[in-house]
Each structure stands twice: as C-alpha cells, then as structure tokens.
C-alpha cells in the first residue's frame, strides 16, 4: 500500500478523533478533509509519471500541513507533519533526480518558515486544553506516519554514481 493511500484513508478519521478527544471544533476539523481527493489522485498520477507522483506527495503534504496549521494553529502540533514531508523528500527520489529533490526540500523548508512567522491567528479559536490534546494527537500521528515511511522505504538503495558535482 502506498503512503498516499495510507494518508487518504486515515484523513476521514481525524474529525472523529477531534470529536472524541476534544469535543469542540469538529466542524472546523472537517477542513482537514479538503486535501483527501488530491492524496487519492497521487497513486493514479504514478501510473503516468512516477517522478510526478514522488514530487506530488511531499508537496501536497506540505501544502496540506500549511492549511491545517492555519486551521488549528501552530500550538496544535500540525507543523510536525513538515518532518514527514521532509522525510519523504529525503527517501523518494532517485540519484538522477537530485535537483528535483533539492527543490522539493527547499520548498518544504520555505513553507515551514512561512508557517512559523506569517500565518497569523488560527481559523478556529482552540482552548489551551484543546491544543494540548491536539498536540498529543498530532505528535502520535506524525510518529506513526514517519515510522510507516521508514518501514516502506527500508532496504531501498538508490544507485549513485559519483559525478563531477559529488567530487567537489
């Protein structure tokens, strides 16, 4: 099962977790479902272009993380998902795709910096108790996702041939 499928299939449960654990903000948390169709499209994109799909997953994840950080606020821990996006960038590309990989890494980092400095107030006013619960939920979700990514890519070696750039 691809990472995109795992993300897409888990997204509908997030508002349920918010409802069960927090009680408030369920309607606001439905916004977390917006990117689900895009995550569902990534395996189909892969049929036409594996590079496009390998680019799409961390980039869509990054933009989804940015939106959810605006929705929930940085104190909710949603920014932790940037780490999963960067991990995807680190493991998803082949040796000949290093410039795509570098561009994706810079994109994830720039969006992260933007989220830390210029996001403003969250779209929903969460209490400090709610944010504490969301932080725990999101920390567990990120740990689970990064573990799944590591297990998925375990043992995959991307062939590298030294070139002039590597010898500098």
Where are these regions (language model features)?
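Alpha-helical transmembrane segments and their interfaces in multipass membrane proteins
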Residues: 12-34, 95-156
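Acidic-enriched, low-complexity/disordered segments with a strong bias for Aspartate over Glutamate
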Residues: 24, 64, 75, 129-130, ...
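Transmembrane helix boundary and interhelical junction motifs in multipass membrane proteins
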Residues: 77-81
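Interfacial segments of multi-pass membrane proteins
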Residues: 89-95
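Heptad-repeat alpha-helical coiled-coil signal-transmission segments
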Residues: 150, 154-168
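Charged/polar, solvent-exposed surface patches and flexible loops
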Residues: 70, 91, 159
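Hydrophobic transmembrane alpha-helices and their membrane-interface boundaries in multi-pass
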Residues: 2-73, 83-88, 105-108
């Amino acid at each position: 099962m691809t990472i995109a499928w795992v993300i897409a299939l888990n997204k509908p449960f997030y508002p349920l977790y918010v409802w069960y654990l927090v009680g408030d903000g369920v309607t606001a948390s439905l916004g977390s479902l917006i990117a689900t169709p895009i995550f569902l499209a990534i395996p189909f994109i892969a049929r036409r272009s594996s590079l496009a799909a390998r680019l799409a997953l961390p980039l869509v994840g990054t933009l989804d993380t940015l939106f959810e950080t605006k929705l929930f606020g940085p104190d909710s821990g949603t920014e932790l998902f940037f780490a999963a996006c960067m991990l995807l960038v680190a493991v998803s590309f082949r040796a000949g795709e290093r410039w795509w990989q570098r561009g994706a890494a810079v994109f994830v980092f720039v969006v992260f910096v933007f989220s830390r400095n210029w996001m403003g107030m969250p779209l929903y006013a969460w209490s400090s108790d709610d944010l504490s619960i969301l932080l725990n939920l999101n920390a567990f979700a990120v740990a689970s996702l990064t573990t799944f990514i590591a297990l998925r890519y375990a043992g995959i070696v991307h062939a590298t041939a030294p070139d002039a750039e590597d010898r500098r």
